[in-house]
């Protein structure tokens, strides 16, 4: 085995733990050459690229070579259960402004009340967002269904979240 540093890791996609759904988490084994620790951000590459927050895998998953992610992350990466993805640790920049667009039928309309910016900000705090991703803000629902946002566009230069 060489002393070269490994840049990425190949893992097979598995279903997320129910409590992780919608939180942008990826459960990965820590006994790997990427030196990952909880809270790190990884880029997940399948057909497309997305990002997730690293969480410790379950003990029974430690030697299986899998990454547990939810359906939103799988869709953003363009992969299905059982597909192989490549992950690598990345450094992120905080975004100052994030443009969100609710995913809904053309005839549906939604109006958000005052305070929605703070609610969204708290729900997305420290979550990695890649331009074009679909995301779910925990606790934000419409008619008891999760409200999905698409065409996400993070901006670095602006000073407020709208």
Enumerate the predicted regions with their spans:
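AAA+ P-loop ATPase mechanoenzymes
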Residues: 17-162
């Amino acid at each position: 085995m060489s002393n070269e540093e490994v840049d990425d890791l190949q893992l097979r996609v598995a279903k997320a733990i129910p409590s992780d759904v919608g939180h942008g988490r990826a459960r990965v084994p820590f006994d790997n050459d990427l030196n990952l620790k909880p809270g790190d951000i990884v880029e997940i590459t399948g057909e497309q690229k997305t990002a997730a927050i690293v969480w410790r895998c379950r003990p029974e998953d430690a030697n299986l070579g899998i990454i547990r992610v939810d359906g939103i992350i799988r869709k953003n990466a363009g992969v299905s259960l059982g597909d192989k993805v490549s992950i690598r640790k990345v450094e992120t920049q905080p975004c100052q402004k994030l443009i969100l667009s609710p995913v809904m039928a053309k005839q549906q309309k939604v109006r958000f009340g005052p305070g929605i910016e703070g609610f969204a900000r708290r729900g997305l705090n420290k979550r990695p967002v890649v331009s074009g991703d679909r995301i779910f803000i925990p606790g934000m629902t419409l008619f008891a269904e999760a409200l999905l946002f698409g065409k996400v566009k993070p901006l670095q230069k602006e000073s407020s979240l709208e």
